Amino acid sequence: MPPANPRTKPKALNYALKFARGSLATIYDAEDWPAPDQLRVAAAALAANPELACVQAPLECYNGGDNWITRAFALEYAIHFHLWLPLLVRLGLPIPLGGTSNHFVVSKLRAAGAWDPFNVTEDADLGFRLAAQGWRCGMIAPPTLEEATTNRADWTRQRSRWIKGYMQTLLVRARPRETGAGAAGALSLCATLGAGVLSAFLYAPALALLAGWAIGAAAGVWPAPPLWAYALPLLVWAIAAASAIPAARRARAPALLRAALWQPIYWLFQTPAAAWALMQLIRRPHFWEKTEHGAADRRPR
C-alpha cells in the first residue's frame, strides 16, 4: 500500500477494503489456522440473521503447552472467547471484537466507517461502533488456532498495545453520543475494556499495599487490615479458577486447568504493561508495537 501515516493495521485494512467486491469480508492474521468449515459457518450465520454485521470465531492457542506463560495465555483466551464473549452476546450487549477471525457484512462495515486507522485495537473499537449503528455482533463455534506469545518481552509488547488501544477506545466511545446501544453499550464498554484497563493498573499495587499493610500489622506498626481486604483478592482468584473449568472444557484443552494455579502471578505482568501503554498513549499514541511470531515449540496438526 502507499506509504502514509499512521502505519497501522487498520490503516492497511481500510486501504484493502476499497478493493473488496464481495458481500462478505473476513480478517485473518498470517499465522492463523482457521477451522476448515469456519467460512461456511460464518456465511450461514450472517445470512440467517439480518441484525448481524459481524460474527467472531473463538481464538485458541495451539502452543498453550510450551511453557507457563503460554498456558496462562491460552487459559485467558479460553475464558474470554468461550465464556465472556458468548455471555455478552446472549445478553444482547456489544462485544469487543478480536483482532482476527472477524467475518463482516461489507455493506454494514462500510456504513459504520470501517476501522479507525488511529486506534491500535481497531477490532475492539469496531465492535462498539457497529453497535452504535444498531447492528449486532455474534459468535460462531469453529475456532481459529493462533500462536501465544512465548516469553515475557513479547507478551508485554503485545499486551501494552492492547491496553493502549483499550484506553483509546474508552476515550472515544465513553462520550455520550459514541457509546452505542444506550445504557447496554455503556455497561458492556465498562465491563470489558474499562474493567480490564483498571485492573491492569491496580492489581500489582493493590497486592503490594495489602502485603505491606499485613507485614506492618504483624510488626505492631499499625492495625491489621480488615477481613474484606484479604477476602476480595481471594474471591477474584476463586471466580477465575471456577471460570477456568468450563472454559477449558469448551476449548477442548483440559490441561489448561493447571494454569489457574499461577494466574494470580501471571496477572502481575499486567501492571508494567499498563504503565508502558500509558506512556505510549501520551508520547506515541499511534505507534504499533509489533508481536514476534514463530517461536512456538509446536504447530497445529
Please name every model-derived segment.
Residues 99, 138-139, 145-157:
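Catalytic cores of eukaryotic secretory-pathway lumenal/extracellular enzymes that build
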Residues 29-33, 115-118, 130:
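The conserved acidic donor/metal-binding loop of glycosyltransferases
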Residues 192-284:
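Membrane-embedded multi-pass helical conduit in multi-pass membrane proteins
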Residues 2-23, 36-120, 160-171:
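Long helical/loop segments within the catalytic core of UDP-sugar-dependent glycosyltransferases
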Residues 120-126:
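Acidic donor-binding loop at a coil-to-helix junction in glycosyltransferase catalytic cores
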Residues 158, 162-170, 258-300:
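Membrane-proximal soluble regions of multi-pass membrane proteins
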Residues 150, 156-193:
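Active-site-adjacent helix/loop segment of glycosyltransferases
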Residues 127-145:
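Catalytic donor-sugar/metal-binding loop of nucleotide-sugar-dependent glycosyltransferases
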